């Protein structure tokens, strides 16, 4: 009697593109052997809008409204890096009050970004309730943003040498009330999620990245700190006024999806600590450097001649970038957000290279999902925290 030979065929499955509110327009071509993942190929570029090329045909001030469309859930950070680079290039000082306002806005934006990571991540692994809870707190942050900047999401609030407007009357008290309320919210999330046996079953030991491996892949942010590397640009680069506050770098050593969750939850608590200290110690003074004057190199120009330039107290539309190159970076919620800027003695940058954290963190995905189960792909992808706006640019 002959035994029938069983044929073992691999199956190729397309995952995505998804709706931007979940994982964005990322397509994964997954090769499966039953439930086991054999290979995974990410397909990018569905949200490419040529952000770097647009930057090379705009002045810095014209380009500010565009940058909020990279990572549209943490827009304060994209604005911060866009003004930090020319500030460093031109050695422009930022008033202390403006620096405090920037830190408050950046940390509120970090919390909002982590909240909108937490909800869809929990929904992916089967917990629907936190998805609705996070919008409650996030809405309060957006109310604060709207009161200070006039916009809920695309704020356009940062300026070269400071911020666009001072904090309105009563805003500081409203923000302090939010901080007290939000600490109880974080405690509620931890009670609901952190010790939940079904949640732990889905994330513990899934998508492990070692410390050396994380460095070799160029990972940054919570992805790096969850692998035991205590690297936070707020401590390393000493930018803005973070050194004046008492806070700790949050890290875990396990390197799995649970560790990445714990790092982000702890970071929200640390952000609240920074915001509270900044609100209580915010100094007086100007909110913008009003002495950034751009004088024309040519002497004795007549006001209506072609090469006459308006001398303003604020950074004028003809703000020139000196002929040098610079790499500036900030610690965004997803990792190191950087810009390599080359000036050419003109109003437009000669080169404007964006280093998005999501794009570089996403590189390790095919390696993490190999030999895992199909259901683990969503857990691992969710724990990386990507926004396709900044991945595709």
Curated annotation (Swiss-Prot):
Name the UniProt key words of this record, in alphabetical order.
Chloroplast, Membrane, NAD, NADP, Plastid, Plastoquinone, Quinone, Thylakoid, Translocase, Transport
- InterPro entries per UniProt: NADH_Q_OxRdtase_suD, NADH_UbQ_OxRdtase_49kDa_CS, NDH1_su_D/H, NiFe-Hase_large
Q: Catalysed reaction per UniProt?
A: a plastoquinone + NADH + (n+1) H(+)(in) = a plastoquinol + NAD(+) + n H(+)(out); a plastoquinone + NADPH + (n+1) H(+)(in) = a plastoquinol + NADP(+) + n H(+)(out)
The UniProt entry lists membrane topology as: Peripheral membrane protein
Q: What superkingdom heads the lineage?
A: Eukaryota
Q: Which PROSITE patterns match?
A: COMPLEX1_49K
Give me any GO biological process, just one.
Answer: photosynthesis, light reaction
Q: Name one GO cellular component term.
A: chloroplast thylakoid membrane
Molecular function in Gene Ontology: NAD binding; oxidoreductase activity, acting on NAD(P)H, quinone or similar compound as acceptor; quinone binding
What EC number(s) does its UniProt record assign?
7.1.1.-
Q: Where in the cell is it found?
A: Plastid, Chloroplast thylakoid membrane
- Complex and partners: NDH is composed of at least 16 different subunits, 5 of which are encoded in the nucleus.
The protein's role, per its UniProt record: NDH shuttles electrons from NAD(P)H:plastoquinone, via FMN and iron-sulfur (Fe-S) centers, to quinones in the photosynthetic chain and possibly in a chloroplast respiratory chain. The immediate electron acceptor for the enzyme in this species is believed to be plastoquinone. Couples the redox reaction to proton translocation, and thus conserves the redox energy in a proton gradient.
Record-linked HAMAP family? NDH1_NuoD
The record's comment on protein family reads: Belongs to the complex I 49 kDa subunit family.
What is the name of this protein?
A: NAD(P)H-quinone oxidoreductase subunit H, chloroplastic
Q: Which species does the entry assign this protein to? A: Guizotia abyssinica
Name of the coding gene: ndhH
């Amino acid at each position: 009697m002959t035994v029938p030979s069983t044929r073992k065929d691999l199956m190729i499955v397309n995952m995505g593109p998804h709706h931007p509110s979940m994982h964005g327009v990322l397509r994964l071509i997954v090769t499966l052997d039953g439930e086991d993942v054999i290979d995974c190929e990410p397909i990018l570029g569905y949200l490419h809008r040529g952000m770097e090329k647009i930057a090379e045909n705009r002045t810095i001030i014209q380009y500010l409204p565009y940058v909020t469309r990279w990572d549209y859930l943490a827009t304060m950070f994209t604005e911060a890096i866009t003004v930090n680079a020319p500030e460093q290039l031109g050695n422009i000082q930022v008033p202390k009050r403006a620096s405090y306002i920037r830190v408050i806005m950046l940390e509120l934006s970090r919390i909002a970004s982590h909240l909108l990571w937490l909800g869809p991540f929990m929904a992916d692994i089967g917990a629907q309730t936190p998805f609705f809870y996070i919008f409650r707190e996030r809405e309060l942050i957006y109310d604060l943003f709207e009161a200070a900047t006039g916009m809920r999401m695309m704020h356009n609030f940062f300026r070269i040498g400071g911020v666009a407007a001072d904090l309105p009357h009563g805003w500081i008290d409203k923000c302090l009330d939010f901080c007290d309320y939000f600490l109880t919210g974080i405690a509620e999330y931890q009670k609901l999620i952190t010790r939940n046996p079904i949640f732990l079953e889905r994330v513990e030991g899934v998508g492990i990245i070692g410390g050396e491996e994380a460095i070799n892949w160029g990972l940054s942010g919570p992805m790096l700190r969850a692998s035991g590397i205590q690297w936070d640009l707020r401590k390393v680069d000493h930018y803005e006024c973070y050194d004046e506050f008492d806070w700790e770098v949050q890290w875990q050593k396990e390197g799995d999806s649970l560790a990445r969750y714990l790092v982000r939850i702890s970071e929200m608590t640390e952000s609240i600590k920074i915001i509270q200290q900044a609100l209580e110690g915010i100094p007086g003074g100007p909110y913008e450097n009003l002495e950034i004057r751009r004088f024309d190199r040519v002497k004795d120009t007549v006001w209506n001649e072609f090469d006459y330039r308006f001398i303003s107290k604020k950074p004028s539309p003809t703000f020139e970038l000196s002929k040098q190159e610079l790499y500036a970076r900030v610690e965004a919620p997803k990792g190191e957000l950087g810009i390599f800027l080359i000036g050419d003695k003109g109003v437009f940058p000669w080169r404007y290279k964006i280093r998005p954290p999501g794009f570089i963190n996403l590189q390790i995905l095919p390696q993490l999902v190999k030999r895992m189960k199909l259901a683990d792909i969503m857990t691992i992808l969710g724990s990386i925290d990507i926004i396709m706006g900044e991945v595709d640019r």
